Amino acid sequence: MSLQTNHRPVLVVDFGAQYAQLIARRVREAGIYSEVIPHTATADDVRAKNAAALVLSGGPSSVYAEGAPSLDAEILDLGLPVFGICYGFQAMTHALGGTVANTGKREYGRTDINVAGGVLHEGLEACHKVWMSHGDAVSEAPEGFVVTASSEGAPVAAFENKERKMAGVQYHPEVLHSPHGQAVLTRFLTEIAGLEQNWTAANIAEELIEKVREQIGEDGRAICGLSGGVDSAVAGALVQRAIGDRLTCVFVDHGLLRAGEREQVEKDFVAATGAKLVTVDERQAFLSKLAGVTEPEAKRKAIGAEFIRSFERAVAGVLEEAPEGSTVDFLVQGTLYPDVVESGGGSGTANIKSHHNVGGLPDDVEFKLVEPLRDLFKDEVRAVGRELGLPEEIVGRQPFPGPGLGIRIIGEVTEDRLETLRHADLIARTELTEAGLDGVIWQCPVVLLADVRSVGVQGDGRTYGHPIVLRPVSSEDAMTADWTRLPYEVLEKISTRITNEVPDVNRVVLDVTSKPPGTIEWE
């Protein structure tokens, strides 16, 4: 399911940049649809996608390096607006007859550029900071291009050709370290390329609902596995809006959920969508499979395998209850655009990473996949969810791992330990919300060090309790993350409440590790 037919995409040509997906997100934040394609794409590939414009991403190479990624020169003859960024700026220069040289002045990090007119930087300070990351630099712009910015290490830090609707910058406008970067990118898209800003949550929701109707048809039936997370909830809400009670949502309670999550799905999701919901209580089955298991990967595998078996049983029940003569042919999944790109979808394929499929279903049950969110980024999914009327408690929910609290208990998972962690997690989430910090942090895993005991003093006696770890992080995409600097008074309140209210916990510690080197989750 794709939105290409309704929106001519701005194609982000990926030269191996870590920021290609981020560029695509920034284009969409400007209100214009975008997709990522590999640099190996040909002019015919671009024509086939009916592109509205091209953005050439950065990359780690020199344009003169052996095997450096190159651009099909015919693409620049298609008459499309083109915007080059960093390596893409240099590749564009090279292809159009300009000069890229090793000036001997590398620039990495925050750098001052001096602006000399032009559309891109109109209204900005004559000297302002941007984020650079380059060795080579453009020393001479292609014929017909006007140089509009320079820096100490880049004689040509930006250029424009309004007649050809082409422009480029040596720096990275897509990162937050370039404070005016979003404005510069938006000015290219609207002022130079002349594109309409019609990519909105309302339009997206309306188009996706119609496409689901087309795919499933007037009589088709579908099943959707709800995890309690944002993606499956929004996917389920979209499909329910499209086909009504021909959708059955299945929620497996594996006992590894946080406080209130089952109730949130059973009450809030159903109330907001009117969806038909089947809840399967598999708590004891999961606990029995996790008994004695302490190794993190073994936990994940045990939880994953048991979830498949639980979902199989739920699907069998739904199939049995389907009206006589009807079948359930479609499986709804919350696959997002980054999953499609990472699995090869950016090059025109439709591979889905295995962990996004419900594997292990019976051989005689074959579903056609319905993936209404496969063109969307996470922030867009949240916006669509709000447009569909889902409560903020669902659409604003922090990311939560599939194995749940099972991988936030360091040690064996038992019912008592789950209750301990669930209580501590609820306190932390409540205090962060009351302090107005939900919009500041990406997520805050709360971890129980169940195999560790620390000595403490509570009341008049010595205690040997477990430590709780708080792991608040800030991120845009979870690929990298920094620990969040929470106010001391909030940390104090969380710590005091947890050590006073949660049995067997006498210490709260703060994880101040960034990613890399540490991952967001402990297991």
UniProtKB/Swiss-Prot annotation:
InterPro entries xref list: Class_I_gatase-like, GATASE, GMP_synth_C, GMP_synth_GATase, GMP_synthase, GMPS_ATP_PPase_dom, NAD/GMP_synthase, Rossmann-like_a/b/a_fold
* Subunit-level organization: Homodimer.
**Glutamine amidotransferase type-1 domain boundaries:** 9-198
So what does this thing catalyse? XMP + L-glutamine + ATP + H2O = GMP + L-glutamate + AMP + diphosphate + 2 H(+)
Where ATP binds, per the record, is at S227, G228, G229, V230, D231, S232, A233
Q: Which residues form a coiled coil?
A: none
Q: Which gene name belongs to this protein?
A: guaA
Q: Which organism is it from?
A: Corynebacterium glutamicum (strain ATCC 13032 / DSM 20300 / JCM 1318 / BCRC 11384 / CCUG 27702 / LMG 3730 / NBRC 12168 / NCIMB 10025 / NRRL B-2784 / 534)
On whether Acyltransferase is a keyword of this UniProt record, the answer is: no
Top-level taxonomic group? Bacteria
Using the record's annotation, list all stretches that form the GMPS ATP-PPase domain.
Answer: 199-397
Supply one GO CC term from the record.
cytosol
What does this protein do, in the record's words?
Answer: Catalyzes the synthesis of GMP from XMP.
Report the PANTHER family cross-referenced here: GMP SYNTHASE [GLUTAMINE-HYDROLYZING], GMP SYNTHASE-RELATED
Keywords annotated in UniProt: ATP-binding, Glutamine amidotransferase, GMP biosynthesis, Ligase, Nucleotide-binding, Purine biosynthesis
Q: Please name the GO terms that the record assigns under molecular function.
A: ATP binding; GMP synthase activity
Q: What is its EC number?
A: 6.3.5.2
Which SUPFAM superfamilies would you find in this protein's record? Adenine nucleotide alpha hydrolases-like, Class I glutamine amidotransferase-like, GMP synthetase C-terminal dimerisation domain
Name by which UniProt lists this protein: GMP synthase [glutamine-hydrolyzing]
Pathway the protein contributes to: Purine metabolism; GMP biosynthesis; GMP from XMP (L-Gln route): step 1/1
Q: What class of enzyme is it?
A: ligase
Signal peptide span: none
Tell me the active site.
C86, H172, E174
